[in-house]
């Protein structure tokens, strides 16, 4: 009976190891590809790959090293995008600037919506297009959204109303695109998978 039990334990152990080997192999390829992307300065792709590697087997050495890289890259990429978004931005609507101009859907009520971004806060203003008078509507502290430590999402912020917005810039860093990807409620985070609210902002010189 004792020998049978030992055999079953060994058999189970061997089965588990055999099943985990493909995962470790896949994790290794993701990690190596992430390192390659990092060396090429493709930091966004590297972050995504390190994130995948960290989730496959978070307890092994590759998993632990990957999560460290995720944290480092998030910090680096957030600093990079923050350096570019500091300043004033005029809202163009829920379409790209070229589309707004082409269809002539600019706001005509004499009020522009403006946001000013600094290292810690986002200030929302209404600006009278005739008098240029600015009225502060609300202020939001910049708080990055981090559901999981291993998450590859680095440019999402959560506002005081629980809405979560992912932010991105165009190549020239003069158009800011924000999209509502989720909302935090008492029941947890609800992802928005369709009809996401979007906003486009152009840099004010």
Listing of model-derived features with the role each one plays in the protein:
Residues 24, 94-101, 119-186:
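Contiguous, well-ordered beta-strand patches that form the walls/edges
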Residues 100-108:
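Surface-exposed strand-loop-strand hairpins of Gram-negative outer-membrane beta-barrel proteins
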Residues 1-23:
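Bacterial Sec-dependent N-terminal signal peptides
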Residues 19-79:
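Alpha-helical protein-protein interaction scaffolds
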Residues 91-92, 195:
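Acidic, glycine/proline-rich Ca2+-coordinating loop motifs
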Residues 81, 95, 110-127, 205:
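Flexible low-complexity loop/turn motifs enriched in small/helix-breaking residues
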Residues 180-205:
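Edge beta-strand at a domain terminus
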Residues 74-90:
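N-terminal helix-cap/turn-to-beta initiation motif at the start of protein domains
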């Amino acid at each position: 009976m004792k020998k049978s039990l030992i055999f079953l334990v060994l058999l189970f152990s061997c089965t588990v190891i055999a099943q985990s080997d493909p995962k470790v192999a896949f994790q290794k390829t993701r990690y190596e590809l992430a390192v390659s992307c990092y060396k090429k300065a493709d930091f966004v792709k590297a972050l995504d790959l390190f994130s995948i590697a960290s989730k496959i087997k978070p307890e092994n050495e590759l998993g632990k090293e990957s999560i460290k890289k995720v944290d480092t890259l998030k910090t680096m990429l957030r600093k990079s995008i923050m350096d570019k978004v500091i300043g004033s931005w005029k809202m163009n609507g829920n379409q790209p600037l070229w589309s707004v101009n082409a269809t002539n859907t600019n706001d005509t009520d004499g009020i522009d919506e403006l946001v000013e971004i600094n290292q810690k806060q986002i200030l929302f203003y209404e600006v009278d297009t005739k008098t240029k008078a600015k009225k502060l509507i609300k202020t939001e502290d910049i708080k990055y959204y981090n559901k999981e430590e291993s998450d590859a999402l680095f440019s999402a912020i959560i506002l005081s109303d629980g809405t979560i917005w992912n932010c991105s810039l165009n190549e020239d860093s003069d158009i800011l695109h924000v999209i509502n990807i989720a909302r935090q409620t008492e029941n947890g985070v609800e992802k928005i998978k369709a009809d996401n609210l979007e906003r486009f902002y152009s840099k004010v010189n």
